Amino acid sequence: MEGVVIMHETVYELHTKKMDGIIFKIDFEKAYDKVKWQFLQQTLRMKGFSQSWCNWISNWVEGGTVSVKVNDNVGKNFRTCKGLRQGDPMSPILFNIVADMLAILIERAKADGQIRGVIPHLVDDGLSILQYADDTIIFLEHDFEQAKNMKAILCVFEHLSGLKINFHKSEIFCFGGAKEMEDQYRQLFGCNSGSFPFRYLGIPIHYRKLRNSDWKCVEDRFQRKLSTWKGKNSSYGGRLVLLNSVLSSLPMFMLSFFEIPRGVLQRLDYYRSSFFWSSDSQKKKYRLTKWDYICRPKDQGGLGVLNLDIMNRCLLSKWLFKLLNGDGLWQNLLRNKYLKGKPLSHMSHKPGTS
């Protein structure tokens, strides 16, 4: 989740300060199926795993078999020569170990002066890469020679690990002076130019504050879920359970990062209210009391339906607690950008801040 905060603040800083920089959003082609077993073993040994542990992992990875199912007919089992089995609880951990080698290669190149990251005034030595599983974002200073070095690093990593980068599905975003050479960068990497907002870990990223239209994905999820319940004659108690356990949880991830616009909040409450009073949300039905009363706790006469506005503020306040009690990359970025060595009590809200 911290990666979303870093991504949002970086994009906002590059755009508002008109700084030069490049963001490269990488797409791996069938990531889990391409991992080379030999590279995995070398990575485990490099990270200090014992030989016994490496042998266990080798037996687990190479000991599996697969079969092909065509028209309900399952073929004979056979062994594969590379890749990690999807659905296995160990596979994500091993994939992260392999993918982390890309970050190591980039950090070594940065230490040698071959590449430089963005926003060095907020992040020590500049921000160069963000990784979460197979979601990888690369940040690069506006310099064509550095871009060539980065392309070479990606090709080397692809050859060593087996993780093939799908450049045709990858996207590049240019800021400041880099926009004038966007075509050259695009041709170098063989990718497309990205547009805002784009999604990172399921969250829309934009250089401005999100508008009502950017929340349409949440409203669409509400409507799709409600359409599956349409026509089912459930009781008030049944609909109350569905409200609290399913419908109210749909926007939680977005509410953890952004303040919900008032118009979006009203529409989501309208969908929930319509479903509660009538199983068909498209049909109007007389409401016996205000929705605010329904959202009150049971000991105050309500039904305990989740108040999205209050929940939104609670989720956002968790970031404040983490900011004051942590020392990670995103905490240092926010402190350097907003606090600048001052205590939090001296911070003032400025219009237009992210």
Task: Cite the ranges covered by each PLM segment.
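A helix-boundary/hinge signal
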Residues: 1-354
